[in-house]
Amino acid sequence: MGGVYNGDGGTCHRGNIPCPLAAQMKTGEVGRQLYELNMHTGVFSHTVVTSDFEAIQVLYAHRNQSNLLVMEILLKRIKTSAEPITIQLESSFKPQSEDIAFQNAPDYKGGRHIFGQTASSEVPGGVRPVVHLIWTPVTPTLTLPANQSQSSWTFLVAVARSNESAQSFYDSGLALINTGDLRPSHQRSWAELWKGSSIEVIGAESLNRALIGCMFYLLGSFPYVNKEASAAFEFGGVSPGGLSNGSEDEDYHGHVFWDQDTWMYPSIALFYPALARAVLQYRVETLEGAQVNAQQMGCKGLKFAWESAVTGVDVCPEDVYSQQELHINGDVILAFQQYYYLTQDLELFQSGRGSEVVWGVADFWVSRVTWDSADQQYHIKGVIPPDEYYFTVDNSVFTNAVAQRSLEFAVELSALLAEVPPPAWQDIADKIKIPFDPELKFHPEFDGYKPGNKVKQADVVLLGFPLAFPMSPEIRRNDLEMYEAVTDPLGPAMTWGMFALGWLELGEAEKAQKLLQKCFKNVQKPFQVWSESADGSGCVNFLTGMGGFLQAVLFGYTGFRVQKEQLAFSPLLPLDVSALSVKGVCYLGHKMDWTITSEEVKVSVRKTDSKETFTLQVVLNSGSTLLLTPGQSVSFPRQPGHICQLKSSSSCWPI
């Protein structure tokens, strides 16, 4: 359950909550067993087919009743018979947890009820979450009476932080059962979600399945938001293994890392601005904890936790990461910047406290850098780069570049809000050291890095994307070649997608596709679940890897780049992909559907009820401009260009 952790400091982990629906269906007869995960409807089913009957067990977490879990059983005769049919439900559920001291409460409307509080809080004197469970008791047997053709049973679990909320969700479930709308309402919500976004390729079926799987697992990890629902709900962020993983000493304890902001967020933000804002709101809610982290380091401003739970105070079990993996600050600000460029939603930065986040991080960098009089540059010493094979290095090129980017956005935001920024922000951004080897024309990972030394994962290549750090194609190529050759083949799953994206930037689609194929080693069949490492080890249901893979296609094949005052594109498809369809791209209040082939690009703008949208145009590198009208489409020969707001001068801001 989101936001429920047990343990203090480095022992903090996701609280283990027992599931009353943990039951296996047994028929007592030999039959054909079928298991299916329908990613379009969000339903998992187990079907047993015998010569006499069919038994179907269906499980789902309700999409818009987000605190409800549901199990349905259907028994259906195949042959007419006067004999009853009985199946067993073998339950492994025990109403107890090593993290939560559960106790019984009075039954509620036929449902069992337990509640309990976690054993300890993540910080001294902090809140210990309370959890309530109300559920329909699962009987050990179910019987289809003689002479009855079929029958069904529904079992509910409502889980919430208060008695009132648990009862309310349970009531909602009962009401939906009575109207026959329990599963249909869940499936409608998933249908609406898929209508909001999809990525589909023609010509590469395994790639298509992987993309659908990545979208499904990512969307299933983010909260339900619609036009009527506010983003001001309890959302505890997304951890690398999602909600179902993260107990003690497992899958990063369920903590939130840069994985959320750098790897999962960009694709979500391009499709669902409301979900993107929920991610940013999580960081706003941990602002006070980030302040504590900075103070404990002897710095000013905000230091976001390398491993975050509810309070934002760092709960990483090893202090060295908390103290040195500073790039998390820049990663968070990059997410805020991307959101603003996609939406121009200044309210988040005004009344929504987003400006406090951006400016607090800028103040941190000011207090953390040191001035080197010899080279007349600012240095950031003693850090861990994204490549965690190295500790206590100086001037990690990614760390310094993302710090520069966050300082520049702090200055930009000040102008937008009519505030005067401290001069130090721009001064440090202008003079921070970005390691570069002028002889070999590449970016060393940090001061003293020796070419040929092994690296863990994508690091320097992130300068090109997502940072868009200015460099020539020659230098971009050198960085890709230098680090591709020395990257650990068993490193984390998101790595090769970033190399593929880099080669697509340089127009080498086939080289990119070979690297993208490496990602399939992390995809575990039959349900497209990702492992952290190519050998199947590491974090299970590795959302970080899925996010990196999605970005490789979504931003690689299309060339989408979220820039100031424009959404740039430069489409390029590999030979085994004849067409790419990307539906639901959100930009400045509009939703666009894109179809890309080797010859042509088609952009359709959906009609909208909103009056607070901008008029958009396509500006092509050839010099042509095309007006984007809601409800209509435009087509043009495949080439680079950008989408921007139509202004009286018919021009766009420079980048």
Curated annotation (Swiss-Prot):
Keyword list, A-Z: Glycosidase, Hydrolase
Q: Name one GO molecular function term.
A: protein-glucosylgalactosylhydroxylysine glucosidase activity
Does the UniProt entry include the keyword Disulfide bond? no
| Binding locations of substrate | W258, D259, K456, Q457
Sequence intervals crossing the membrane:
none
Give the UniProt entry's GO cellular component terms: cytosol
Q: Which reaction does it catalyse?
A: (5R)-5-O-[alpha-D-glucosyl-(1->2)-beta-D-galactosyl]-5-hydroxy-L-lysyl-[collagen] + H2O = (5R)-5-O-(beta-D-galactosyl)-5-hydroxy-L-lysyl-[collagen] + D-glucose
**Positions annotated as active site in the UniProt record:** E388 (proton donor)
Spell out the Pfam families in the cross-references.
Answer: Glyco_hydro_65m (PF03632)
**What GO biological process term is on the record, naming one?**
carbohydrate metabolic process
The UniProt record lists the EC number as 3.2.1.107
Family the UniProt entry places it in: Belongs to the glycosyl hydrolase 65 family.
Known function: Catalyzes the hydrolysis of glucose from the disaccharide unit linked to hydroxylysine residues of collagen and collagen-like proteins.
Q: What is the protein's given name?
A: Protein-glucosylgalactosylhydroxylysine glucosidase
Could you tell me which species this protein originates from? Answer: Danio rerio
Taxonomic classification, please? Answer: Eukaryota, Metazoa, Chordata, Craniata, Vertebrata
